[in-house]
Amino acid sequence: MLSRESSTLIARYRFAISEYSSTEDHIDEVFRRINSNGKILSKQELRSAGCVSNFSELVRKISTIIRGDTTHSDIMGLNKIHNISICNDGLDYGINIDNHFYIRNHIISRPSIRDSDDEELVANILGYIFLDDKPTSGSTSLDTFYGEGSTSHAIHTRTQLENYIQTNGADKIVNNYLFVYEMIQKLFDANNLNFRSHILGNASSSQECPRYYQAVFLALYELIINENMQLDDEQKFIAQLGD
């Protein structure tokens, strides 16, 4: 227990505080952008900061599992934060993604994952699955999913996303998504194939191909989850996917 003198010193400590007036939305935007090390936040980081919808939580949960954070929890002590960070080369803590399926197959690069582009991929896929009016993939749709826009269309889109989750259940959605993800991973790993090279050809110099992965994922999701079909001949399927 602190002495009375120490407690008094702490209580009398003066903090440097700046005050200014602004609108509530502007203040929220300022706090969304604050970070401890001056890093410029990516578009997806800005979208998810402060967004508490069921959709954003579902995207975060699926992305976290796929990224490899098996110790994920909504509540964590500050001394354990480094354990859920993507580690830098040579460090013995955090999540090592150098051998991740996305990176090995040039679906998403390591820097892009650090910018949460893997969350964008999940959000685009879920948005397409959930919505009757199929959205295009890109910033405009993602901004709408995460709360931007007050038009009737934007509000209806977010309502439909939330209703889909409540109707089908978050756990079921997560399990279905992971089932398809793991199926694609096993198909390419078991056949010693690289996703980018197999889909785009060996001559491709593209460092990433998230949209092609999204197309394959959604096709399998439709057949396996929605139509309850099974993959009978893996080799023929793989051949059909080839360039």
Specify the residue positions occupied by each region the protein language model found.
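Basic- and aromatic-enriched surface patches that contact anionic nucleotides/nucleic acids
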Residues: 1-137
